[in-house]
């Protein structure tokens, strides 16, 4: 069986993190819809760093974008420049309307559906032919009840599952990652879970956490060749999913780059 690596970048600013908004217990009191929509200094630096990185290689990459970022003119204008510069390399996935941690709250089919409809509408407007029916739950909070709603809204791929025991709570109360994966399968959605090592996370924040960082770097560098998800899905081979955050590109004075093979 052929194998490939799919790389993606989550477009989260600090205001989107569960620490600040969207989570019933982890967030401060600021309501998610009233959060300041201005881009943080590090996010702006990350935009510069990402552009530098894109100019340094020819990897195909997926951006998982939170739709409310397009409320910001600076981001919208920059995004259009990037898409115009790299139209064949970039695909876009849905990372939610405003980064609500859905599975941490009581089941809300109607609210989730409304958020998908609105976020899809916004992304279709700005992303055009680069948009794909791919979803990544904000902060990886995904529960089985969300799969039928994703299917109803035309999604074909989900990449929300981080199959590590350290974050199993994100599947929702009394749920497991296997239940999430089965629900996706039952609803004819391809689940592409994140790569782990020894059941430890190696994506996203793990790239910068002591010990996990060392494990992640070695695993990433030994991963299969990078290919677009469009191609990998056609081949129906084994897919290794690796991802990081746009904010990572603000590190090292906007010169940080992921430890890709």
PLM regions and their residue ranges:
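Histidine/acidic-residue-rich catalytic or RNA/ligand-binding cores of hydrolases
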Residues: 103, 169-174, 251-260
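Non-membrane alpha-helical structural segments and their capping/turn regions in soluble enzymes
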Residues: 40-44, 109-117, 219-223
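Active-site beta->alpha N-cap acidic-glycine motif
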Residues: 1-83, 132, 249, 255-257
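Surface-exposed, active-site-proximal loop segments in enzymatic domains
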Residues: 21-31, 98-110, 205-210, 257
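Active-site-adjacent pocket scaffolds in enzyme catalytic domains
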Residues: 129, 136-241
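Metal-dependent polysaccharide deacetylase catalytic core of the NodB/CE4 family, i.e.
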Residues: 59-144, 167, 187, 196, ...
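Active-site flanking residues adjacent to catalytic metal/cofactor-binding acidic residues
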Residues: 7-9, 94, 157, 244
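Active-site and substrate-binding clefts of carbohydrate-active enzymes
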Residues: 237-261
